[in-house]
Each structure stands twice: as structure tokens, then as C-alpha cells.
């Protein structure tokens, strides 16, 4: 199925989106935005086809859950900070095969994990904010893990 090409611990602060909008915070997170764009550029140069995000804002009560629908599309408003992120559109392809493979391999190792290919299961901002900048051209497929 491929190989791990790049790993990064990154920010996903909602103020990155707020930084795009007119007002007193315009440009406040430009450094982080530029960094995300650079990660996307490096991934393209390495031939990456899918970005996997471990999303700390996808809250679950048990196990690891892998959101690997065929496609993610919608308009997102943060329940946590609706004054920072509201009406943010997104549209990305998913990678159900990779998501299922991750779950299967995790279970073999004794990790409680489950893959979900559910069209109504949406992405959270811990995935959406990085994808907005790393994947603005929709080059990469997306898998989100809780």
C-alpha cells in the first residue's frame, strides 16, 4: 500500500483560519500557514498520495476510530469556537482502503480500532485546518484518526 514518507507534529489552531479574515487578527498566523503550505509542497515532491491526520478534536470515548470515507464535503462551523471558525467549506477525497488497512493492522497488534466509511461522519477542525493549507488544491486523499 505504500510507505510513510513524512511525519510532522503540527499546529491546527483555529486562529489560522481567523488569520485569513479581515480585521485585527488578519495575518496573525501567517508563519503557521506558510509552514503548512511547505509541508504540502514537500509531500508533493515525495509523491505522497494520502495525508493521515491524528485529530485531537475528534473526541471519542473508546478505542481509535478511523474516518476513511470515500469523500468529505461540507461546510464546517466549530462547536468549540464558532467565532473563530464558521462556514468554512471543505471538499476532499478519502482513502477507504488505507483506513481499513490501518484498522486491521492495529487490531492484529491488540489495539482497539475501527474504520468507518460513513458519508455522514464529518471531519473535525483538527483535520480541516491543516488540510486547508497543506491540501488546498485537493491533491491528497485524507484519512482522519481519533
Question: Which stretches of residues belong to each language-model region?
Answer:
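Soluble secreted/lumenal catalytic domains
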Residues: 1-146
Amino acid at each position: 500500500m505504500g510507505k510513510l514518507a513524512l511525519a510532522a507534529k503540527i499546529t491546527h489552531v483555529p486562529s489560522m483560519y481567523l488569520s485569513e479574515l479581515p480585521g485585527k487578527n488578519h495575518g496573525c498566523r501567517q508563519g503557521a500557514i506558510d509552514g503548512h503550505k511547505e509541508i504540502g509542497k514537500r509531500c508533493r515532491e515525495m509523491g505522497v498520495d494520502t495525508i493521515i491526520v491524528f485529530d485531537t478534536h475528534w473526541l471519542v470515548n473508546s478505542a481509535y476510530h478511523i474516518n476513511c470515507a470515500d469523500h468529505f464535503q461540507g461546510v464546517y462551523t466549530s462547536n468549540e469556537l464558532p467565532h473563530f471558525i464558521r462556514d468554512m467549506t471543505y471538499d476532499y477525497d478519502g482513502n477507504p482502503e488505507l483506513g481499513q488497512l490501518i484498522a486491521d493492522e492495529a487490531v492484529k497488534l491488540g489495539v482497539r480500532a475501527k474504520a468507518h466509511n460513513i458519508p455522514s461522519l464529518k471531519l473535525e477542525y483538527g483535520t480541516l485546518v491543516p488540510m486547508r493549507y497543506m491540501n488546498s488544491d485537493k491533491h491528497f486523499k485524507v484519512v482522519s484518526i481519533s
